[in-house]
Structure formats: C-alpha cells, structure tokens
Amino acid sequence: MRRIAVVGAAGRMGKTLIEAVQQAPGAGLTAAVDRPDSTLVGADAGELAALGRIGVPLSDDLAKVMDEFDVLIDFTHPSVTLKNLAFCRKAGKAMIIGTTGFSAEEKQRLVEAGKDIPIVFAANFSIGVNLCLKLLDTAARVLGDEVDIEITEAHHRHKVDAPSGTALRMGEVVANALGRDLEKVAVYGREGQTGARDRQTIGFATIRAGDVVGDHTVLFAADGERVEITHKASSRMTFAKGAVRAAMWLDGKAPGLYDMQDVLGLH
C-alpha cells in the first residue's frame, strides 16, 4: 500500500484529499497534519472528511509523523509548504505540491529539493486542465502572432492569490510557445486610458466571487474569428484525484522536480 499523508487536513481541500486517498486502490491515508492552533487536533481524519473512523488522528506537527508515510500531499501556503519541504528533503520523503503563490526565488527552492527527493509540483492537478495546457501550446504555435491573447479566471471569494497559479501557468505555456517572456509581456488588469492594445502582450483578468471552484479561459482573438479554450471545475475532487494519481505515479521514481504533464505522459 502507498502510504500517504495530507497536510492542511482539516481544511476544505484537505478533507477532499483525504476522501480521494481513501477511494484510491492501493493507497491509504496513514498521517494527517494541520496547524498547531487547530481545535481539531486529535480528531480522527476519516471523521473530519465524513468517511467514518479510520484510525488516523489529526496531528499538529509533521515531524512527529515522518515515519508514518511515503509521500506527503501539500495544498497549503508557500511559507508552510517550504517548511514541510525541508522536513521531507531531510527524511527522503516524496512530495506532491499543489500550493500556489510561490515567488520565483521560492520556486527555485523546489528545484533544489528535487535534486534529493522526487516531487510533483503543479499549479493544477486536474487532468482536464493539463490537457488544456497541451492544447494551448498547439493553439499558440498555430495561431502565432496573428491573434490577441487574453486569459480570464474565476475562483471563490476565499482564494488569496491572483491571478491563479493555473492562469499564470497557462500564460507561461502560451508565451513559451511564442518565444516571449511572460514577465515582460503580461498585463494584469486594465483601467483608464490604456491606449491601443499591443499584440505582443498577454492579458490577465481575475474574478473572485461566491463558491466558484475554478474557471479558466484563454482567448485567441484574430480579426474575423476567435478561438477559446476553457476549463471549468465543478468540484475540488478533480484536483484531489489528480494529486493522488501523482502520488501513486511517484512510487519508485528518481529524485527530480516533475509536473502533471510528466504524470500524464503529455510531454
């Protein structure tokens, strides 16, 4: 059995991950961790996820359960994830990282850790989103510089980073396909007298409202026609199942920093 730990286990995504782990053949939840000030510490992780008792108590310290898992799934916050990364690197434990909002410097720390342990890091673990990334690469190469490119995304009111990591990843894929540097061509929102649009730019627009799980659309607009590639998530379970699939795929893999394109064989 693949022994899996979930950090942030008492949160919305954490509970969904617990359910996904318990549903996956050959996988089992053997550790669950949440923040030290959580009032739920000591509770059964299965009961937190409405699955019934599974005999895995919620811990407040990852260091206490390092011997109880093979791979850690972390969808928390950059500062928390980096601390957990240090523990896993020292202990030789694999990691699945779905946290977004990392700076360029913080992402480099993931690269360095990948020299010692196997890691799957992705802005989005949905199989559909990763298929969209493949389609975006093709669309950008075919349509080239003859289109204006705009990326819109919508998420629930609780999401703390914008644009979403998925939207930024989509922008990176498109920019790379066109030989552009996203940092130089990205435009984040528009207001006032902006002047005529520069076709080399890639625009981003963000919506935060209600309980939207995650909508992403990339628009390729030419004179006379438009192409839109859209993904809409209706449940967090799609991300959780992808993360568990990645955790199973990492079994026996050499140290390295992988992504979902590797897991799905889309590279």
Swiss-Prot record:
Cytoplasm listed as a keyword: yes
Keywords from UniProt, A to Z, are:
Amino-acid biosynthesis, Cytoplasm, Diaminopimelate biosynthesis, Lysine biosynthesis, NAD, NADP, Oxidoreductase
- Keyword NAD found: yes
Q: Which GO terms describe its biological process?
A: diaminopimelate biosynthetic process; lysine biosynthetic process via diaminopimelate
Enzyme class per UniProt? oxidoreductase
Enumerate the NCBIfam families for this protein. Answer: dapB
Q: What is this protein called?
A: 4-hydroxy-tetrahydrodipicolinate reductase
- The encoding gene is dapB
